[in-house]
């Protein structure tokens, strides 16, 4: 039986004991060693190795049959002890003699038949319910428990003065277990209940209600009844039982849970509470049996403000829906909540209704609900969460005549906005609209209440916000989390937006001008998006750094790079890219400036080190080597005595003798000089012609003095005619000193033409360049050339 009782009082224990438990545990919540849990361990006795400083001990759901003083006497700091769901038959409160700080004691759901009491001044919570007591186990010592706030008891029968010892206490909660209660001979018993805020009565779960006890309580705020089974015959017995309990003016809240009854009896119960002072009637786990017919109901003036029915099972499948729904629709109360039921519809009140709050969560309502209804003028809040709504525009049309509606919740339906026909009819009074967890797309923004302040669209199918959206100038909070948006929406159409939730979307490159567009934003939640850490993201991260830290929710932990792979998982706060790699203009200017600097530097170095001269000389050397390898065979077979004939002015003889001859002759190059090799007795012209013919090449040392010499011109003339032919390159010009073309006499047209057509070697004034000059000059001679000695020629 204890297993059946467990769920019955779960919620009551939670409500009544939560404050006490939290208050008791908070001072030592951080001391893990002071909380010991041995529940559900199949223990038959209390463990011996408990820590001496234990403050909270749970031994529930075991097989302990006895509690002795040595078991807990050493736990001097014990404040909470749970022994529920064991096999204890007897309890002597003297075992707690050394536990003077004990505040919470739960020995419910045992087999207790008797107890022995002693003073326990600190006790606040005492639960003796769901045991095997014959009469209420209330000792006179209980009257000294001045701190007691919760008292749980059970008995098979009552006596009027059983609770007299605790009548003067100010209790918050009293739990009476009446599961084992039975009447004898149809007699009616009486019981005076002490003053308490909450009275919870638990009846047998499988028996028809049969309690005949006149209970009276002077000050009661909340009455809770559990396990009520009724039919049409004993329905009146429950109302008789409740008559005395509900008489007091302080009773404002009545809760019935786990109730099985007929529809006729249900209507009678509603009618019973209608004239009573009860303001809040709550019914949980209602099962309707037998038939459902239209029942008469008198909607007189009532103190009832709210009727809440949650979790209804209807065992009647064929019935008049009008008979069922009209009873609720015509109630003249402010708040009606019917949730988790098989109801498929709710009719429109036939006359102007008093409803300001309607909650129809988790039913089977369709798009036809309240269509064309014009009697809900006072309705301020409508909740249709978890139903079968599909057409978004019909939902809008449903609200058209609800002129006071401020809050509408149609989340967790199957709403879609595909069939947009530009007919958008919302109640203009709507301020809060919850459209989350539906199948809406971006077109929903074309049809929204114009004055909405809070809009929840999270978990839909929105990929983008259209440009032609409804201008929602009053919108302050927008939740579009868990959609497929790729960018942060600007505030062009939402000028008053202050809160934006857009996490868990597909935002990879948030707009850098978001914060400029949304000047009033005070809370942004945009984490858990696949941010691409590229140049486009730099400005957004920079803008985040400019706003207050509390504005960006979840920063920086929820803002991480998703791409590229090398940066995946990196916090945006730690992501950095150089300005140069992200600014195209700056990059272009930098590259251009660098190239310009390099060009200027290169030009300067070229000029400073005379690089063009080196290049020119290298090209000449290369060409000379190439031509030397392709000398015609007939050139090599000529009878030659000299490698070179040198023509120069007497003014340049010092350079020829000191520079030219030593550098050529050291490599066995035979040179012909007129003053050294001309044959005396012959004319100068004959010697010139003769030795030019005997030389492989002719070298002319050009200078301003050269062009002033007639003989030098003759030598040049004869060399040009004798050594030059098509394809040959045996004339070498060395420019010792610069010669301007204008300074060459016109009669020396040969020289002028040669200098214009032929490449010549310039004598470098810098000594560092002279090595390349000599290498270039020597490369012009074929070292394997077979020369004939002068003596051999004579013979």
From Swiss-Prot:
One of the GO BP terms on file: detection of diacyl bacterial lipopeptide
Naturally occurring in which organism (per UniProt): Mus musculus (Mouse)
Keywords: Cell membrane, Cytoplasmic vesicle, Disulfide bond, Glycoprotein, Golgi apparatus, Immunity, Inflammatory response, Innate immunity, Leucine-rich repeat, Membrane, NAD, Receptor, Repeat, Signal, Transmembrane, Transmembrane helix
Subcellular location as annotated: Cell membrane; Cytoplasmic vesicle, Phagosome membrane; Membrane raft; Golgi apparatus
Domain (TIR) ranges: 640-781
Sequence ranges assigned to domain LRRCT in this UniProt record: 525-576
Positions of transmembrane segments: 585-605
SUPFAM superfamilies, per the entry: L domain-like, Toll/Interleukin receptor TIR domain
Pfam families on file: LRR_8 (PF13855), TIR (PF01582)
Any single GO CC term annotated in Swiss-Prot or TrEMBL for this entry: Golgi apparatus
Glycosylation sites: 42, 114, 144, 195, 214, 253, 285, 359, 401, 434
LRR repeats: 54-77, 78-101, 102-125, 126-150, 151-175, 176-199, 200-223, 224-250, 251-278, 279-308, 309-337, 338-361, 362-388, 389-414, 415-437, 438-457, 458-478, 479-500, 501-524
Segment forming the signal sequence: 1-27
Main location: membrane
Record function comment: Participates in the innate immune response to Gram-positive bacteria and fungi. Specifically recognizes diacylated and, to a lesser extent, triacylated lipopeptides. In response to diacylated lipopeptides, forms the activation cluster TLR2:TLR6:CD14:CD36, this cluster triggers signaling from the cell surface and subsequently is targeted to the Golgi in a lipid-raft dependent pathway. Acts via MYD88 and TRAF6, leading to NF-kappa-B activation, cytokine secretion and the inflammatory response.
Family: Belongs to the Toll-like receptor family.
Disulfide bonds: 117-139, 235-265, 348-373, 424-447
Tissue-specific expression: Detected in thymus, spleen, ovary and lung. Expressed in macrohpages.
Membrane topology category: Single-pass type I membrane protein
Domain of life according to the entry: Eukaryota
Identification of the protein by name: Toll-like receptor 6
Gene Ontology MF terms in the entry: diacyl lipopeptide binding; identical protein binding; lipopeptide binding; NAD+ nucleosidase activity, cyclic ADP-ribose generating; protein heterodimerization activity; Toll-like receptor 2 binding; transmembrane signaling receptor activity
Summary of subunit composition and partner proteins: Homodimer (via cytoplasmic TIR domain). Heterodimer with TLR2 via their respective extracellular domains. Binds MYD88 via their respective TIR domains. Interacts with CD36, following CD36 stimulation by oxLDL or amyloid-beta 42, and forms a heterodimer with TLR4. The trimeric complex is internalized and triggers inflammatory response. LYN kinase activity facilitates TLR4:TLR6 heterodimerization and signal initiation. The heterodimer TLR2:TLR6 interacts with CD14 and CD36 in response to triacylated lipopeptides.
Alphabetical list of SMART domains matching this protein: LRR_TYP, LRRCT, TIR
Keyword Protein biosynthesis among UniProt keywords: no
């Amino acid at each position: 039986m204890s297993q059946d009782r467990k769920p019955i009082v779960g919620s009551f224990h939670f409500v009544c004991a939560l404050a006490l438990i939290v208050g008791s545990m908070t001072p030592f919540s951080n001391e893990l060693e002071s909380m010991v849990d041995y529940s559900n361990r199949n223990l038959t006795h209390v463990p011996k190795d408990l820590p001496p400083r234990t403050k909270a001990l749970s031994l529930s759901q075991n097989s302990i049959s006895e509690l002795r003083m040595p078991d807990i006497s050493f736990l001097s700091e014990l404040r909470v002890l749970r022994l529920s769901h064991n096999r204890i038959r007897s309890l002597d409160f003297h075992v707690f003699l050394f536990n003077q700080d004990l505040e919470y004691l739960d020995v419910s759901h045992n087999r207790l038949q008797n107890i022995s009491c002693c003073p326990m001044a600190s006790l606040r919570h005492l639960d003796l319910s769901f045991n095997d007591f014959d009469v209420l186990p209330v000792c006179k010592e209980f009257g000294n428990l001045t701190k007691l706030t919760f008292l749980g008891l059970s008995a098979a029968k009552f006596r009027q003065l059983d609770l007299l010892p605790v009548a003067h206490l100010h209790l918050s909660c009293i739990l009476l277990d009446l599961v084992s209660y039975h009447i004898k001979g149809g007699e009616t018993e009486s019981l005076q209940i002490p003053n308490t805020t909450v009275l919870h009565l638990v009846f047998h779960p499988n028996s028809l209600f049969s309690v005949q006890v006149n209970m009276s309580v002077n000050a009661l705020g909340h009455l809770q009844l559990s396990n009520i089974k009724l039919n049409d015959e004993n329905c009146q017995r429950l109302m008789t039982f409740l008559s005395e309990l509900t008489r007091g003016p302080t009773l404002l809240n009545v809760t019935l849970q786990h109730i099985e009854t007929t529809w006729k009896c249900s209507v009678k119960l509603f009618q019973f509470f209608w004239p009573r002072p009860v303001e809040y009637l709550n019914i949980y786990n209602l099962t309707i049996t037998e038939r459902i017919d239209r029942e008469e109901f008198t909607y007189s003036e009532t103190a009832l403000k709210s009727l809440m029915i949650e979790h209804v099972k209807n065992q009647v499948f064929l019935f008049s829906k009008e008979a069922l729904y009209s009873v609720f629709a015509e109630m003249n109360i402010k708040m009606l909540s019917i949730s988790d039921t098989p109801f498929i519809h709710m009719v429109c009140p036939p006359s102007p209704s008093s409803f300001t709050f309607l909650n129809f969560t988790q039913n089977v309502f369709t798009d036809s609900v309240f269509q064309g209804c014009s009697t809900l003028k006072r309705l301020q809040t409508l909740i249709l969460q978890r139903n079968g709504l599909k057409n978004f525009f019909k939902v809008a049309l449903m609200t058209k005549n609800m002129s006071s509606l401020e809050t509408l919740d149609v989340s967790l339906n199957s709403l879609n906005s595909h069939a947009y026909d530009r007919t958008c009819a919302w109640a203009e009074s709507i301020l809060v609209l919850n459209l989350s967890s539906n199948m809406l797309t971006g077109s929903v923004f074309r049809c929204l209440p114009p004055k909405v302040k809070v809009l929840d669209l999270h978990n839909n199918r929105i990929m983008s916000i259209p440009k032609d959206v409804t201008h929602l100038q009053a919108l302050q909070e927008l939740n579009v989390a868990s959609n497929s948006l790729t960018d942060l929406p600007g505030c062009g159409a939402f000028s008053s937006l202050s809160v934006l939730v857009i996490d868990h979307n597909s935002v990879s490159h948030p707009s850098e001008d978001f914060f400029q567009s949304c000047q009033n934003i005070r809370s942004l939640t945009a984490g858990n998006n696949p941010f691409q850490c590229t140049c486009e993201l730099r400005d957004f991260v920079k803008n985040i750094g400019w706003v207050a830290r509390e504005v960006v929710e979840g920063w920086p932990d929820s803002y991480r790079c998703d791409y590229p792979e090398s940066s995946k998982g990196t916090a945006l706060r730690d992501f950095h890219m150089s300005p140069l790699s992200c600014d195209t203009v700056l990059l272009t200017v930098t590259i251009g400036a660098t190239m310009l600097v390099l060009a200027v530097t290169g030009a300067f170095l070229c000029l400073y080190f005379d690089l063009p001269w080196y290049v020119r000389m290298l090209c000449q050397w290369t060409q000379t080597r190439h031509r030397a390898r392709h000398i015609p065979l007939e050139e090599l077979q000529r009878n030659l005595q000299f490698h070179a004939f040198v023509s120069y002015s007497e003014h340049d003889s010092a350079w020829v003798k000191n520079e030219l001859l030593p550098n050529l002759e050291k490599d066995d190059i035979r040179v012909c000089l007129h003053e050294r090799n001309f044959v005396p007795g012959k004319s100068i012209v004959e010697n010139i012609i003769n030795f030019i013919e005997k030389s492989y090449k002719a070298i002319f040392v050009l200078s301003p003095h050269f062009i002033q010499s007639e003989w030098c011109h003759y030598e040049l003339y004869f060399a040009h005619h004798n050594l030059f032919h098509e394809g040959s390159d045996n004339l070498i010009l060395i420019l010792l000193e610069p010669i301007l073309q204008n300074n060459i006499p016109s009669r020396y047209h040969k020289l002028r033409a040669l200098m214009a057509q032929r490449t010549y070697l310039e004598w470098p004034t810098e000594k560092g360049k002279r090595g390349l000059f000599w290498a270039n000059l020597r490369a012009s001679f074929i070292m394997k050339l077979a020369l004939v000695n002068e003596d051999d020629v004579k013979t």
